Amino acid sequence: MTAPVLCIMGPTAVGKSELALSLAERLGGEIVSVDSAQIYRGLDIGTAKPSPAVRARCPHHLIDIRDPAERYSAAEFARDAQAAIAAIRSRGRLPVLVGGTGLYFQALQHGLSPMPAADAQVRAELEAEEAAYGVQALHRRLQAVDPESAARLHPNDSQRIQRALEVHRLTGRPLSQVQREPGQPGLTEMPLKIILEPPERAWLHRRIEARFRAMLAAGLVGEVVALHRRGDLSEELPAVRAVGYRQIWHYLEGACDYRTMIRRGLRATRQYAKRQITWLRGQTDGVRFTADDRLEAQVHSYVTGALGGV
């Protein structure tokens, strides 16, 4: 019998990674990271990346697979995750997927049409950039990443310019190329989806603050300093735009003081968690558990039963 795909889903700081590790160790599994920031080498503290000791206890996949100067699309993730799942199954082990990047889960389960759906977060970022720098600045940026589309669009065609840039950010490829590509299939079977929910919003906010302050104490600013000093990175890149990293990047460039950076970092993380929770509400094929003291025992019991008493 082919091992199913077990997915551990939930907002940031809810306790997904700890649960996934426990399940993988108890059920003979290997972990596949579903995190758009953990793919980057050098982004360790701020992404809560599993330590070398944890990775020695249980194999982890799709971590440290890209340089921060590179982009990585949902389509690439779906391809790489399917390869990792096949390899894990070939060893007779259980694929355990864990993370909070909804677009990655969506791409893996349902596949991708050549044209990605609109993304509210990316669109909001582009609208803010247009408000700050003007539509012609966005058109110049489009010329750099997709000259074919830029030549076709009027420099004042805000809506279509934003869409072309949005497609590039979501896929890592020019709109003109995506329009010529076939779609990508998803999983052929239904994954077993476990969705973790915080007991209350205040509980999650306390955990977010405690974790962010612990990351700062562990050297997160120094980690971003090392990235900043490379000289080949900018806010155009997804690695630098990751929650926490972006706010510290602004602090290093003198845009705010240390206390303001902390406040903005916490706010950005809370907003990210809110978006994740909103997306997870639409995952009607998942089984929901409250992240309390009984979580591990309850999920283990449920998963063991669902897998036929493993």
Curated annotation (Swiss-Prot):
Residue ranges of coiled coil: none
Binding site for ATP: G10, P11, T12, A13, V14, G15, K16, S17
GO molecular function: ATP binding; tRNA dimethylallyltransferase activity
UniProt site (Interaction with substrate tRNA): T101, R123
Keywords (A to Z) from UniProt: ATP-binding, Magnesium, Nucleotide-binding, Transferase, tRNA processing
Catalytic activity: adenosine(37) in tRNA + dimethylallyl diphosphate = N(6)-dimethylallyladenosine(37) in tRNA + diphosphate
Region listing for Interaction with substrate tRNA, in residue ranges: 35-38, 159-163, 274-281
Binding positions (substrate): T12, A13, V14, G15, K16, S17
SUPFAM superfamilies: P-loop containing nucleoside triphosphate hydrolases (SSF52540)
Cofactor(s) listed in the protein's UniProt record: Mg(2+)
Tree of life domain: Bacteria
Similarity section: Belongs to the IPP transferase family.
Subunit-structure text: Monomer.
NCBIfam families from the UniProt entry: miaA
Function summary: Catalyzes the transfer of a dimethylallyl group onto the adenine at position 37 in tRNAs that read codons beginning with uridine, leading to the formation of N6-(dimethylallyl)adenosine (i(6)A).
Protein name as catalogued: tRNA dimethylallyltransferase
